[in-house]
Amino acid sequence: MARASRSIHARKKRRKLLKEARGYRGTKHTSYKRAKEQVWKSGVYAYVGRKQKKRDFRALWIQRINAAARRHGLSYSRFVHGLRLAGFDLDRKVLADLAVSEPEAFGAVAAQAKNALEGRPVERRVELGGAGR
């Protein structure tokens, strides 16, 4: 029985890896060893980046909410506390979007949070405005 040669599989494997490494600078796109190291490291960076993306967006949403809340005389922490007291269950992503795209609706929510902080009864039915809603 003839000896099995790995040359076809090995070449295919190397070609596949070098294809993944296209666009890398220096030896990292031509040398198999360096390309292999860089492709692996790129995977690590991508994994970490996916986790960081979540943190970065949360921080951005908080900054936007804070800026909008301060326009209505509340700090971010007091605004969020007021929302909890008022019984609002809106996440930061929705609040940030509201603050950017519909400031008057955010103002209505901020007024409800302010009322809850001051101990006034909270209106359960609030019209947030907007056409066709």
Curated annotation (Swiss-Prot):
Protein name, as recorded: Large ribosomal subunit protein bL20
Transmembrane annotation, as ranges: none
Gene3D superfamilies documented for this protein: 6.10.160.10, Ribosomal protein L20
GO biological process: ribosomal large subunit assembly; translation
Entry-linked PANTHER family: 39S RIBOSOMAL PROTEIN L20
Functional note: Binds directly to 23S ribosomal RNA and is necessary for the in vitro assembly process of the 50S ribosomal subunit. It is not involved in the protein synthesizing functions of that subunit.
Keywords tagged on the record: Ribonucleoprotein, Ribosomal protein, RNA-binding, rRNA-binding
A molecular function GO annotation: structural constituent of ribosome
Family label: Belongs to the bacterial ribosomal protein bL20 family.
InterPro entries: Ribosomal_bL20 (IPR005813), RIBOSOMAL_L20_CS (IPR049946), Ribosomal_protein_bL20_C (IPR035566)
Pfam families: Ribosomal_L20 (PF00453)
GO cellular component assignments: ribonucleoprotein complex; ribosome
